[in-house]
A protein has these predicted regions:
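C-terminal accessory "lid"/substrate-recognition subdomains
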Residues: 16, 21, 48-68, 235-375, ...
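A transmembrane-helix-recognition feature enriched in membrane-embedded lipid enzymes
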Residues: 49-108
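Residue-level signal for inorganic ion chemistry
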Residues: 84, 124, 179, 213, ...
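Walker A (P-loop) phosphate-binding motif
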Residues: 94, 98-149, 160-161
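Conserved beta-strand elements of the Class I
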Residues: 142-144, 228, 324-327
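Phosphate/Mg2+-binding loops and adjacent switch elements
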Residues: 148-284, 291, 298
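Short, flexible loop segments at boundaries between secondary-structure elements
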Residues: 354-357, 399-427
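Acidic beta-strand-to-loop metal/phosphate-binding motif
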Residues: 377-384
Length: 443
């Protein structure tokens, strides 16, 4: 993702990314994943695999104390390139703001969801929550995703028509597939140009509202509402721009946001939430600020999770007291493990794979062997892991059941003001929702 962002700014920035990959190759090769870690009173087994470029890049730039001459040199070079990157980003934005490069418009209400940092902030579950809410207001809504890591190539790809899935996770990409899985009645489209996929959604699905998933930097398209997500656990990364840090653009650019949505506020460190409020207000006096949390909703059998849109499972509370093996390949496994602990699950052990790891049949055989050895009642994985499990494994008869934990976003502080504003703006542009009762309850 980091390289993809830099690649959008052609020339010097693209060349810089190639140089950085070469420089980090030796560094990555020498690093090994930590073998054993412990959280609370649970044993944690970390697999002995080499993590990918993005994992080590994040580890490197977030080190608070840069040790050694070589690492200091790398950081100095990164900082130099980050200054170049900042100028390119500012130039590109200026060209759009002054009209030197024309923005395209869609004949519908456009909402952009995104962030100013590389990495996850909860865009996918937030897009799901927002799409459901708008649909319940009576508007036809579609989600436009760029198709990150998708094998599909073309102008417009239909992941879901709102009734059935049209692509698998490998073809559509993880994010788009997960969106489609949870959104009956909401088409999900992928394609590099949101104006193209947006027009298709309007013409073929009658879309009245288009949600741009990860669209904060997609300046090519006009939008009616810009929603900026900020992870309350990892606030603005380390404060530096790419490649010295994880900022996609300067913090001053949060002045574009109409809404600041803080995610995972229940897991935030002391002082993090006031800091986000203060930082946002220093650049943006008028935007709404909302706080949200991620809540576990249900556990779905892996085979059922793959079946079709909106697969059902058991309530999250029913897993309380059960002995489970947690398995994950995500950036923050401790958060996933803490969620299980908070639910009252007896997590006997947790197997951590590198972030974005693609599970092979050998990996899953190791997981099953470990589960049987420990005598657990279930294996629990995240939805991001579920899309990486091979199809043969999904269809196989497992002696220990595999469950996928499904998480949803819940808006808290600022919720009423946000939905009141959203309803007013939708009604002003589109009129009242026509397809369902106007006073539908918004969760």
């Amino acid at each position: 993702e980091t390289l993809a962002i830099i690649n959008e700014n052609k020339g010097a920035s693209k060349k810089s990314a190639r140089i950085l990959v070469d420089m980090l190759a030796a560094y990555e090769a020498r690093r090994a994943l930590r073998a054993q870690q412990r959280i609370s009173n649970h044993r944690v087994q970390a697999t002995q695999k080499v993590a990918n470029f993005q994992t080590y890049f994040i580890d490197l730039v977030h080190d608070k104390e840069v040790r050694g001459v070589s690492r200091r040199l790398i950081m100095a070079i990164f900082y130099g390139f980050s200054l170049i990157y900042e100028q390119l980003v500012n130039l590109k934005l200026t060209m759009y703001r002054w009209g030197w490069v024309k923005k395209e418009q869609l004949d519908c209400f456009v909402i952009s969801l995104g962030n100013v940092t590389v990495g996850g902030t909860g865009k996918t579950p937030t897009a799901q929550h927002l799409a459901r809410a708008i649909h319940e207001m009576g508007y036809r809504v579609a989600i436009l995703n760029r198709g990150y890591r998708a094998k599909w190539r073309g102008d417009v790809g239909i992941v879901s028509d709102g009734r059935a899935l049209k692509m698998d996770a490998e073809t559509a990409g993880d994010e788009a597939f997960m969106l489609a899985k949870h959104l009956p009645n909401v088409p999900v489209l992928i394609g590099p140009k949101r104006a193209v996929t947006g027009r298709y959604a309007i013409e073929h699905f009658g879309a009245e509202v288009a949600i741009l998933d990860d669209g904060y930097q997609h300046w090519q398209l006009e939008r009616d509402m810009d929603i900026l997500l900020v992870d309350a656990v990892n606030v603005f990364g380390n404060g530096y721009l790419l490649p010295r840090g994880t900022l996609r653009e300067p913090l001053s650019h949060i002045d574009r946001a109409d809404v600041c949505l803080m995610t995972k506020v229940d897991q935030a460190a002391p002082g993090a939430i006031p800091y986000i409020w203060e930082t946002f207000r220093s650049y943006n006096q008028d935007g709404l600020i909302i706080e949200s949390i991620h809540q576990p909703r249900q556990f779905v059998r892996l085979s059922h999770w793959y079946e079709d849109i909106g697969a059902g499972g058991i309530p999250a509370t029913e897993m309380e007291g059960k002995k489970v093996l947690a398995v994950s390949a995500i950036g923050n496994p401790a958060s996933f493990e803490q969620t299980l602990t908070d639910l009252g699950v007896e997590m006997v052990e947790s197997m951590r794979y590198p972030d974005h790891h693609d599970y092979g049949e050998r990996d899953m055989a190791e997981v099953l062997y470990r589960a049987e050895t420990l005598g657990v009642e279930a294996i629990v994985i995240t939805e991001k892991d579920a899309v990486k499990v091979p199809g043969d494994v999904v269809r196989a008869k497992w002696r220990v059941p595999i469950y996928v934990i499904s998480v949803e976003v819940t808006f808290q502080k600022g919720r009423e003001a946000f939905f009141r504003t959203l309803k007013e703006q939708l009604a002003a542009k589109l009129g009242n929702g026509r397809h369902m009762p106007q006073e539908a309850d918004v969760v």
